[in-house]
A protein has these predicted regions:
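Catalytic nucleophile loop
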Residues: 20
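Flexible gly/pro-rich beta->alpha loop and the following alpha-helix that scaffold active-site loops
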Residues: 1-14
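Glycine-rich, phosphate-binding/catalytic loops in enzymes
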Residues: 1, 31-32, 76, 108-110
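Acyltransferase
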Residues: 103-150
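Short amphipathic alpha-helical segments and helix-helix/interface helices
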Residues: 3-4, 81, 144-145
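Pocket-forming structural segment of enzyme catalytic cores
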Residues: 24-102
Length: 150
C-alpha cells in the first residue's frame, strides 16, 4: 500500500529491479518467473531515449513484471519488459547503480553460484563491468535527473 500511495500522491519513485516489480504489483500489474533469468550486461530497446538509453545495462533477475494498468512500457528486450513509467515514477528491471565494487559485493555474498549456474565466468563479468563503468555512469546520469520531471 505504501508504494501505491506514494505513486498515486504524485511523488516521484524510482523502482530498481525488485523495486520495479514491487511497483508493478502494487499498481495492479503482476510479477511472474520469466522464460529465463538475466544475469550480466544486456542491451535493451528504449522508446524514450530522452529518458533512458538502450544500454547495455546490468541485469540480475529471474522474474518479470506485467506493466500495470495506466503504466507505459518504455523499454524492453526479448526476455522482459525493462522499464515503465507511471505518472512521475519509473520502474526499471536493470541495475543502474551497479559498478565493480557493487558487483564484487554481490558475488562475495552468494552471487558466484548464480553466475556459475548461468554458465558465466565471474571474472569475465567483472572485467566487463570495469570496462563498462564510465559509460554506465554516463547512461545513469542521463536518465536520473529527468526521472523527477516525468
Amino acid at each position: 500500500e505504501w508504494v501505491k500511495n506514494a505513486i498515486e500522491a504524485d511523488k516521484p519513485v524510482l523502482g530498481i529491479c525488485f523495486g520495479g516489480q514491487l511497483m508493478a504489483r502494487a499498481l495492479g500489474g503482476s510479477v511472474a518467473p520469466g522464460p529465463k533469468g538475466e544475469i550480466g550486461w544486456t542491451n535493451i530497446w528504449s522508446e524514450r531515449q530522452d529518458l533512458l538509453s538502450n544500454g547495455p545495462w546490468f541485469q540480475f533477475h529471474y522474474d518479470r513484471w506485467q506493466v500495470p494498468p495506466g503504466g507505459v512500457e518504455i523499454a524492453r528486450n526479448p526476455i522482459a519488459s525493462q522499464a515503465f513509467i507511471y505518472g512521475r515514477s519509473m520502474g526499471v528491471q536493470f541495475h543502474p547503480e551497479l559498478n565493480a565494487a557493487v558487483l564484487k559485493g554481490w558475488l562475495d555474498w552468494g552471487g558466484l553460484r548464480d553466475v556459475g549456474d548461468d554458465g558465466q565466468d565471474p571474472q569475465i563479468m567483472m572485467d566487463q563491468t570495469v570496462a563498462e563503468d564510465p559509460a554506465s555512469k554516463e547512461r545513469t546520469w542521463h536518465f536520473a535527473p529527468k526521472s523527477s520531471s516525468l
